[in-house]
Amino acid sequence: GAKEFTEDYLEFMRDQQKPLLDMGIATMYLDNFSARGVKHTYRDQSKASIWSTYVDAFMALEYLSKDSKFNKKKIGISGFSRGGNISMMVGEKRIRDALVSKDLYFAAAQPRSPECGMTGMFRNPQPIKETKMWLVHGMADDLTLNGPCVEQAKKMNANGGNVKIDLREGWHHMFTGNFDAEFVKNFQTFYKCPPWYTEDDGSANKEWLDMLLKHSVFKSEKEFDKISKENPKAAFKKIFKGLKREKCIGKGAHVGGDNGKIFMPEYLSFWKKSLID
């Protein structure tokens, strides 16, 4: 959430600013939370729906594209965890086409540790071919597993995308945090739950819907669609109730790992090659 911009344990986010600026790359931080009255989401993900944050990213792109100080063909995006989801989904053509001009795109995206199995990503992605993507995920990440993201990236590449898959042995979630990895018992995990994908027609996948209907949190697919459109927060709470009844929610995961200084040179090199060279 927004608090992370200033937290001591996330110096990586601030350490990137000066070297990027020295290259001629300005840094803009996109706060998806404060305007929605939220500081963080780890207690209640319904406070800021993940799809609304995809909208935010494209609104930011459109805003920057209208400013003559910036080269609109050389804008990149990066983030970890939910920010990783945003950085991955900005490569989806159908979202872009629904929100902004079809000639706008992020030149490069660098997602870290996104959640790809339980966030409604398209089962059949239609990537924006101009977006060069470098997906980095820790092989020791037990909060958001790398497997679903690897499969998603492979599908993106098969459909004309440009995604480099980079898995790091021993790295956990928040691997650029400047503290040793630690186990947090209160974190919830969802990788044992049925996967949630968005089909080509915009509907949720059958396996996901069947689980929700089985536990009577929605009466029908029609009701699921109606509540999701009219009251996303209420829909999220109903979905969470269904997952609890499915008994697939796990507890506890590792976070951290002082790998920011190791990762930073590669990170800066990616932006130089993608936006400057």
Residue ranges, per PLM feature:
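Short beta-to-alpha linker loops that shape the active-site pocket of alpha/beta-hydrolase fold enzymes
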Residues: 32-38, 115, 171
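Short amphipathic alpha-helix adjacent to the substrate-entry channel of hydrolases
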Residues: 7-29
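Alpha/beta-hydrolase fold nucleophile elbow
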Residues: 69-81
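Alpha/beta-hydrolase active-site loop
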Residues: 12, 45-68, 89
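C-terminal catalytic histidine-bearing segment of alpha/beta-hydrolase fold enzymes
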Residues: 162-277
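Short glycine-enriched nucleophile-adjacent loop
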Residues: 62-65, 84-99
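Active-site glycine-rich loops that stabilize anionic/oxyanionic intermediates
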Residues: 1-7, 139
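The feature captures the conserved acid-bearing segment of alpha/beta-hydrolase catalytic domains
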Residues: 101-170
